[in-house]
């Protein structure tokens, strides 16, 4: 009997729930909240069939105990809005399982370690003007409603942009679905963004992050990218309408369209490679700056490929 088979036989939904809900110290602070645990049990009783099926499927993934240790909120994820508005509990369960089934299908290599790591992994490190440092990381999604993975761009160790996504099936194809695009924390002023843009020759942090993202998912053999808009972001769900009204102000559509993204139904279909301006179309006095911009983008591509292959 293999270790994987043994792990699957020993691990079951009851044991999984006991370990995340009853064992202290709790594997995630939310499980330590009595209100959260009560809500979890109540929601399980409201949707028993889908919940039991989901728990069984989780326990039949490869090395399920290790996965739950690294992602302790997985049992509760189907109970709350996920990825975008209107996604029912069955579709939420399917999306989560599709992501981990896809990720676990990889051979044992750098990519798989990055995708399943419980910590952030460096994907790119580069320098801008004046010794400014830009680092891009991949790690578990810190915004648990927006997917399973997050890429984070840091400027001189300050996070300025985060892109959250999952690998799911859509219209019969494997895609990367971007469900969140966050800027810096509230305490980070706009001057930091201006400094980062200036030190990267006019490249916005989100633009650099998207270059890293497209390179990374290509390394994962995924060519199709879709994204939510600000109108169907998960926080537009009715239950968050007033709670998040003042905090959610992002205009996703504007950024997607700047990348030549195309609206397809409720989602945007995004390019897997952003087209660059031809040299002859750039005014001569700006060509030197554009060369430096493209050098930074090329460096990001090289760094991501180097760290993930």
Regions found by a protein language model. Give the residues of each.
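Charge-rich, low-complexity intrinsically disordered segments
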Residues: 254-309
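Noncatalytic linker/hinge segments flanking ATPase motor cores
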Residues: 74, 87-88, 207-208, 217-223, ...
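Acyl-donor binding region in acyl/amide transferases
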Residues: 161, 170-263
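Generic preference for hydrophobic/aromatic residues in regular secondary structure cores
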Residues: 122-130, 134-138, 214, 223, ...
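Charge-rich, low-complexity amphipathic helices
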Residues: 122-125, 235, 239-240, 274-279
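Non-catalytic substrate-recognition and accessory regions of acyl/acetyltransferase enzymes
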Residues: 2-195, 288-309
